[in-house]
């Protein structure tokens, strides 16, 4: 019963957060914030001092690991971090992991559902391929493979030399039995130095791996 309830909520969120729907911003809130918002990609340059202030109080190692909150509840600290830095890559990953771990679309004490934080990040920095990749990983973990593929493809278009994104897109393509394209992205990921053999092994098992150069 609980699993069915969560699934219904996720389907509703998927409809609400479709990029084609104008009210996604109303549902997930606008990006104005008392502190920020700042671009996480500039967190070691232009916004280094701002990032330090946020992380030392709200994104401690225990928060990042999803163990417990620092200044408040875990969900509250993640929310604060992601309102100040909407595209904070590591905080987005933690928010998604906690939601998956707790089997809930909205982490306790977070202001918005997990998907909203990705929606906000994409609205803030639509050209951030790491955000699209993290969102794709979340959708893939939920079993929403088609939506995950769309996000992975956007991520690869923005970050074509990122080995992890290429690898994960290959895994998603393998899931839908698109072996030819899975092989292309697998080979690219390995050429870029991705260390794990899992995707290659799965393609070998399916009889789809070859050692021809791309």
Describe the function of each predicted region:
Residues 24-76, 84:
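N-terminal leader/linker segments that initiate helical-solenoid repeat arrays
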Residues 91, 131, 165, 198-199:
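TPR alpha-solenoid repeat register
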């Amino acid at each position: 019963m609980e699993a069915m309830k969560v699934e219904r909520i996720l389907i509703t969120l998927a409809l609400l957060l479709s990029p084609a729907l104008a009210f996604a911003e109303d549902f997930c809130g606008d990006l104005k914030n008392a502190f920020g918002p700042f671009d996480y990609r500039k967190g070691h340059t232009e916004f280094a001092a701002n990032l330090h202030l946020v992380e030392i109080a709200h994104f401690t190692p225990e928060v990042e690991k999803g163990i417990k909150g620092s200044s408040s509840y875990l969900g509250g600290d993640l929310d604060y971090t992601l309102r100040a830095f909407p595209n904070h890559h590591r905080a987005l990953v933690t928010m998604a992991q906690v939601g998956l771990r707790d089997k809930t679309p909205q982490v306790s004490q977070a202001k918005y559902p997990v998907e909203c934080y990705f929606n906000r990040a994409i609205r803030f920095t639509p050209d951030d391929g790491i955000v699209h990749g993290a969102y794709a990983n979340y959708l893939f973990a939920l079993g929403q493979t088609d939506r995950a593929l769309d996000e992975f493809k956007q991520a690869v278009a923005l970050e074509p030399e990122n080995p992890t994104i290429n690898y994960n897109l290959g895994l998603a393509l393998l899931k839908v039995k698109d072996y030819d394209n899975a092989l292309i992205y697998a080979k690219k990921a390995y050429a870029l130095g991705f260390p794990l053999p899992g995707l290659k092994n799965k393609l070998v098992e399916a009889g789809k791996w070859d050692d021809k150069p791309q």
